[in-house]
Amino acid sequence: MSSIDPYQYIIVEQQFSHKFRVKVVRAENVTKGALGDLLDTPDPYVELFIPTSPESRKRTRHIDNDINPEWNETFDFILDPNQENLLEITLMDANYVMDEKLGTTSYNVSKMLKTGQTETVPFLIGKATNVYLEMALEVCTKLDLRFSLALCDKEKLFRQARREKVTLGIKKLLDMEKPRFLPSTPQEVPVIAIVGSGGGFRAMVGFSGVMKALYESGVLDCATYIAGLSGSTWYMSTLFSHPEFPSKGPKEINAELMKSVSSNPLRLLLPQHITNYIQALWSKKANGQPVTFTDIFGMLIGETLIPARMDTKLSELHEKVNEAQCPLPLFTCLHVKPDVSELMFADWVEFSPFEIGMAKYGTFMTPDLFGSKFFMGTAVKRYEENPLHFLMGVWGSAFSILFNRVLGVKDTVGGEHYGGRA
């Protein structure tokens, strides 16, 4: 067993995509035809479209009244090298009512451009117009997703630093002054995890008492991880997002939490809160992100438990563990399918200040990329990192169970209502 490296990299098979970079340089002799040119000078722009690319459509700005425009705008497409990728180039004329198509042509990227090659190609559109594109193709060797079953580098460093804290914690807890009773090598230091169950506010309140006892008894100093689901993650979020934790212990933070939970829930429906909800949802929708009831649920949970920390993000919690001063929090939830029973399909998703991912598939990302659009391991559309209260809504699995009860969703086994027996 001593020959086994617990940090060995187990590489998961992955495919590399291609990055196709197109620079729309300029156009010459843009024309709308003899009659059209007499009536109006073109306001040209160029549209690029690759059907096989996830972010398939790009366009330049339009330039007013110019038959020899210069754009010098660069666009990136992520391509699957196993598919035939065809670039469609369309020259358009901007108008107030409806834009006019002046012409189109195509270019087979897969057949005509090699990786590592850069070309400047003139494309004839119509009978007289030339559009000049500078194109390059390269292999995306640096991916935004990490494909591995091993721990990330930051967590490895945390584990190494936490060993020393745990050793001191065990010595203090058990009052061991004789070194021979303590772990003699780093490998002998036990990895202890504290796990909280799900169950909404009931689980949150129960876990708050457990954490208070573990903190005051010194057991928390012997732990490497704290993991939770649903209501337990709500308490973990409240604890780790508190600006004075860990210098201020759970006893004081629990007193603040008690006031928050005891407050009138109708305050969440006050006009100023409703306005904030609408503005946040509208901003997210305007950025192209999906808006679901989870957003609203997360806002309600956040306003109840962490009203002064609604802008806190998961990645910011690394400050609590950057010197291994606290156990590493692991927030979990289940990935399920709406049309398949969770008994048949359910994948665990784990969240930490370092990474978010699924160990089953060996796929992880940094917290700021959660919710982004990916293609073959590359983030093709990035969004601002989700706030912590949104993730609290995601982790709130109890809400999904209650919602299924309201809808009367039946489990596939035995025909009983899911969770019908308390």
Task: List each model region and its residues.
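N-terminal charged/capping segments associated with class I S-adenosyl-L-methionine
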Residues: 125-191, 247-248
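Helix-rich "cap/lid" substructures immediately adjacent to catalytic or cofactor-binding pockets
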Residues: 170-226, 257, 261
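Patatin-like phospholipase A catalytic core
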Residues: 219, 242-243, 249-422
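Catalytic nucleophile loop
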Residues: 197-199, 223-239, 331
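Structural signal for hydrophobic/aromatic residues that build the beta-strand cores
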Residues: 20-24, 44-48, 60, 75-77, ...
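Short Trp-Ser/Thr-centered turn/loop motifs at beta-strand boundaries
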Residues: 55-62
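C2-type phospholipid-binding modules
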Residues: 1-4, 28, 32-41, 64-72, ...
